[in-house]
A protein has these predicted regions:
Chain B
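C-terminal, charged interaction/regulatory segments at domain termini
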Residues: 225-289
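Charged, low-complexity surface segments at secondary-structure and domain boundaries
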Residues: 17-30, 126, 149-151, 213-216
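N-terminal low-complexity/intrinsically disordered pre-sequences and tails
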Residues: 1-117, 264-289
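Internal, hydrophobic cores of structured domains that mediate oligomerization or house catalytic pockets
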Residues: 88-170
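Amphipathic alpha-helical protein-protein interaction segments
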Residues: 124, 130, 134-135, 199, ...
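Core residues of folded domains in eukaryotic genome-function proteins
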Residues: 58-62, 78-84, 103-104, 124-129, ...
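Terminal interaction module
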Residues: 150-251
Length: 751, 289
């Protein structure tokens, strides 16, 4: 019975979306800053489960840190347990940076059996980054040769695959000579070549190294991996490498990705899904391999990278450009929020603006910069991508629904983050909603609807309401509730936006989009009337289910408070088709909700009236007397229904309950006159029974007429104690109880 | 504007071109075409040998030329068209004459004021992209442009409605010698075996019909196009008892040009090149917006 009333009143308008708002600390990538934190950052939000997982990983790490020589896997259950823990956590969400030192250390030290070492290495999947120090210390293990050849090979393959995940590489570059010396091992040679290929910089190319490579080639014959390294050397120092190398080689290196690539992608995807806003994609290499499709129709959000074009125009220009490059901060290096703050004045935007969608740091930047070209680039890209990938407009796209869903989800999260809708998204919705089946990507589409920008755009009816209404009436109860929910969010976003504009208007900002206040009020009113209409029809179609009524009343909880909470000079009463089903509901939840709403309407209307009187000037917007009249009619009906048992006589609403006594007699209901008040109302009768049982435990006749006078007051207290807070505020505000004897009257708002 | 040098745009004629729409190019500059060619050729080489280092500027197997075509535009507001050509150098001899053109692509805008008026300076409006050659090259060149100028490409399909407009417009055009038949291809796709119906009309007959339909010369309305097509349909129905209106128009070919609904065009008359490109530019712009 406990309703959400308590938390309701003090809520600030702008906090509505805090679910998707950002926690700045979450952008730090950890690793180099605070490993502990980054571990937590990469956890999924379902905390309970993770708490235990976190614990088991910590236990496993401390076990592996202390493990003594030669524990047998078969005999030692602790080893088994911890090994499985590491494996399962690694595959599910990847390992935190600090795990690598411990696990690499144990795997390469040769303390444990090879099967254990192999399994450990195979599960070394990073959640974010791999600390360079852990790699360096494992190279030193490699040099003392404690581990077997197979483990060495596996380690090298791991290193090649994970190369881009290592946070720094300076020390690793310094180990170039060590790696080079491993070339002599015939088995390791191909992998070492690949690693060297990744590590080689111009200063590494030395005559003695070239000689060594040529010797190896003479010994082993033309090997593609040696050729690759030689060709790179030749590229750096053509004067030192004089031999001719075959121009076309299909593949230089065997696939050394090993068992990790798939795991990395899976972990990446999962971590991205679980975070409130997409995690930064720190690497360009690990884009999920999308299916083979036409080149221009891949749904891939580009990775941030700086536009390097125009770099080498000519020699002179080159210098200038290089100088400029030193000045600007390449977007690839942007990893933490503090970096963003330090370099915000010299940050260059990525060459493909779409990449900001998956780069929260850049979204912060977008948020605070006013540059038309940024939005135009996003607009074009997003508009094209949405149209091209739309699964119900483009044939043959239905097999890619999951990807499209993910994309829409990303767009929605970005909109939440920016607290602003994209116009390309709006256009997409207008274009495609008429063709939508209401099923495909349902929740994503309905969420995007919530971010349609507020403008005095007159076509919103034919573009949004008409197609939505068609689907609404022909779809399930659940769909109806989802539509109402997203229209409520839409209304709230509009109202919040209006509040923000009002606030900033003092700083001489005018409504963007050239919306006047009256245009804006009209647009909001149109939405509320639309919801009133579809709600009325839906209640009839579905036969007044409480579930549906809840969503409808939830919408009106926002509507009834627009004047006070959002400073919008507009109040619209619910239509009779919503009001009466709620008033006569069999469920106390709906009745209580209605009471609360009517109480807030009263508060808002009274405040408006007072404002009007105190200002003594003609306000641009005045609530029409129609609104006051409608409110009064509803209140009279409510008081008659809940208090004075006079609803059939007093209700003056044209579509109300006023009925002739003769007609009422025909219903053969005894004492019809009293059949509606807080005791007899079907939604309240359950409380009355319980109250009677407590007040007169011996009386089993259920004599409701006993509840009167002082007992009536007790009964009220009893109802309030049951959590009917809405009823309480309504009765206390709208019912004049000073002179109980003379018929209780409705508090009248009209002054 | 018909004073463009027909020689310089002649390369477009009598070839099949695949059509794409392109969103405005960001920070594209006509002053850097040679640099673009160099970067693009390195990019192509890099794409071909997956992930291996490539030096920028050296002689590579594929030569890239990026040039400006000021003749190919409608008004002064239009950007000059950009032509991208890929030629294969034969590996045996290094002589220039051995180069073989393998792919060309042309970005253009003919009377695209609708779009170009609206966009800020940093953007270059060349909404129509035509390609001839292997799609693998289109893919590489397209990706490079996407990456470098933050634009998006979409295949420009031509709807049956637009095809019928083309049929009517092109039928009415004057051509010196009317040798090519006007041909319309319809597809009945809902059958177990797809069925294509080809409907060829003598160009003079078609023109005579169109002349009776068109009220004001130089101006075409949707209604006139509908009447023209309906006449053709009823004529066909009289002979074969098939309602063509129930099928889908997939291809139109006339002496002026031929167009396929998948977004393929072939220009046949240089004097009407600008006109056809203008129509295609319009389609491309509506595709973007």
């Amino acid at each position: 019975m406990q309703r959400r009333r308590t938390s309701k009143t003090p809520k600030q308008p702008l906090k509505v979306h805090h679910k998707n708002q950002t926690d700045l600390s979450a952008w730090q990538k950890g690793g180099r800053i605070d490993p502990e934190k980054s571990v937590q950052n990469h956890q999924s939000p379902n905390n309970q489960k993770n708490g235990s997982k976190q614990g088991s990983l910590e236990q496993a790490l401390s076990y592996f840190e202390k493990v003594q020589d030669r524990v047998s896997l078969k005999k030692d259950s602790a080893l088994q347990k911890h090994l499985t823990a590491v494996e399962s956590i690694a595959l599910q969400r990847g390992l935190p940076p600090e795990a690598f030192a411990v696990l690499l250390n144990v795997a390469l030290s040769g303390k444990l059996a090879d099967t254990v070492n192999t399994r450990l290495l195979k599960s070394l999947v990073p959640a974010s980054v791999i600390p360079e120090t852990s790699v360096v210390s494992s190279v030193s293990w490699l040099c003392v040769g404690k581990c077997s050849g197979n483990v060495q090979l596996l380690f090298l393959r791991w290193l090649i695959t994970m190369f881009d995940f290592i946070d720094h590489k300076e020390q690793l570059y310094a180990l170039y000579g060590f790696f080079f010396s491993f070339l002599q091992d015939e088995k390791m040679c191909p992998y070492v070549c690949h690693l060297l290929y990744l590590l080689t910089r111009k200063e590494n190319v030395k005559p003695f190294r070239i000689r060594r490579l040529l010797d190896l080639q003479a010994k082993m014959g033309m090997q593609s991996h040696l050729q690759a390294l030689l060709s790179l050397y030749k590229l750096f120092c053509p004067e030192l490498v004089t031999i001719t190398l075959p121009g076309k080689v299909k593949t230089y290196f065997k696939n050394s990705e090993g068992p990790w690539k798939a795991a990395i992608n899976a972990v990446r995807q999962r971590n991205q899904q679980n975070s409130p806003v997409p995690q930064p994609l720190f690497l360009g290499t690990a884009q999920p391999q999308s299916r083979k499709r036409k080149w221009n129709t891949q749904l891939i959000i580009p990775v941030s990278s700086t536009n390097k074009n125009n770099l080498e125009e000519d020699k002179e220009k080159n210098h200038v450009d290089l100088y400029r490059m030193n000045e600007s901060f390449p977007v690839e290096q942007l990893q933490t929020f503090s970096q963003l703050l330090q370099n915000i004045h010299r940050l260059e935007f990525p060459s493909q603006m779409g990449s900001v969608l998956i780069n929260p740091l850049l979204l912060h930047y977008v948020n605070c910069i006013k540059d038309e070209s940024i939005f135009l680039r996003l607009y074009y890209w997003m508009g094209q991508t949405l149209q091209e990938e739309c699964t119900w407009c483009v044939a043959d796209n239905n097999q890619y629904e999951e990807e499209f869903k993910d994309f829409l989800e990303t767009v929605y999260k970005t909109e939440c983050f920016l607290q602003e809708g994209f116009s390309s998204c709006e256009e997409f919705l207008y274009k495609t909603l008429p063709l939508w089946d209401g099923f495909c990507c349902r929740s994503q589409i309905l969420r995007l609807v919530t971010w349609i920008p507020l403008s005095s755009f007159s076509e919103i009816k034919s573009h949004l309401y008409d197609p939505l209404a068609q689907l609404f009436f022909t779809s399930s109860l659940y769909f109806k509730c989802s539509v109402l929910e997203s229209l409520k969010e839409l209304l709230r976003n509009w109202l919040n936006w209006h509040v923000v504009i009002l606030d900033s208007e003092s700083g001489s900002q005018v409504h963007s989009l050239n919306t006047t206040l009256s245009g804006l009020v009209n647009t909001v009113a149109e939405l509320i009337h639309f919801v009133g209409w579809i709600s009325t029809v839906a209640l009839r179609l579905e036969n007044n289910p409480t579930f549906l009524l809840y969503f409808i009343l939830d919408f009106y909880e926002t509507v009834c408070d627009m004047y006070l909470r959002y400073n919008l000079p507009l109040l619209i009463m619910p239509p009779a088709g919503v009001f009466y089903p709620a008033l006569l509901s069999m469920d106390s939840v709906s009745l209580n909700q209605l009471c609360y709403i009517m109480y807030r309407y009263r508060t808002n209307l009274v405040a408006a009236k007072e404002n009007e009187l105190s200002k003594r000037k003609i306000l641009q917007f005045k609530f029409s007397t129609q609104t006051y009249r409608e409110y009064n009619q509803y209140v009279i009906a409510m008081v008659g229904c809940l208090w004075t048992s006079s609803v059939f006589q007093k209700d003056v609403h044209p579509r109300g309950l006023c009925m002739d006594d003769e007609l009422l007699k025909k219903t053969a209901v005894q004492e019809f006159k009293t059949s509606f008040n807080i005791v007899y109302h079907p939604a309240m009768m359950g409380y009355a029974v319980l109250f009677l049982q407590q007040a007169w435990p011996d009386d089993t006749t259920f004599n409701f007429s006993l509840i009167k006078g002082k007992k009536w007051n007790w009964y009220l207290e009893y109802l309030y104690a049951q959590g009917l807070k809405g009823l309480k505020v309504f009765i206390e505000s709208s019912i004049n109880r000073v002179s109980q004897a003379s018929h209780n009257k409705a508090g009248n708002v009209e002054v | 504007k018909e004073n463009a040098d027909p020689q310089r745009t002649a390369f477009l004629l009598r070839k099949q071109w695949a059509l794409y729409s392109v969103t405005p190019l960001y920070r594209f500059s006509n002053a850097h075409l040679r640099a673009y060619a160099r970067l693009l050729s390195a990019f192509i080489a890099a794409e071909k040998q997956k992930g291996l280092a490539v030096e920028v500027g050296v002689e590579l197997d594929i030569k890239v030329a990026v040039s400006s075509l000021p003749d190919l535009r409608g008004s002064e507001q239009d950007q000059a068209a950009i032509l991208v050509q890929l030629s294969l150098r034969s590996s045996t001899s290094k002589k220039k004459s051995e180069e073989k053109l393998v792919w060309s692509g042309c970005f253009c805008c003919v009377f695209g004021d609708d779009l170009s008026e609206k966009i800020p300076q940093d953007f270059t409006c060349l909404p129509l992209f035509l390609t001839n050659g292997a799609e693998s090259y289109t893919s590489i060149v397209g990706s490079w442009f996407q990456k470098t100028f933050d634009c998006s490409f979409r295949r420009l399909a031509i709807s049956p409605l637009n095809l019928s407009w083309m049929a009517a417009m092109w039928t009415g055009c004057k051509v010196d010698k009317l040798t090519t038949a006007t041909e319309l291809v319809f597809s009945v796709s809902c059958l177990p075996q797809p069925l294509d119906i080809s409907y060829a009309i003598h160009p003079e007959d078609a023109k005579a019909l169109w002349d009776t339909v068109q009220k004001t010369p130089g101006e075409i309305t949707q209604e006139e196009v509908d009447v023209f097509m309906d006449c053709l349909y009823s004529h066909f129905h009289r002979h074969f008892k098939i309602h063509l209106s129930a099928t889908k128009l997939v291809k139109v070919s006339t002496a002026i040009a031929s167009a396929h609904c998948d977004g393929i065009i072939k220009f046949l008359q240089s004097q009407y090149l600008t006109g056809v490109l203008m129509l295609l530019t319009e389609l491309a712009i509506s595709h973007i917006q």
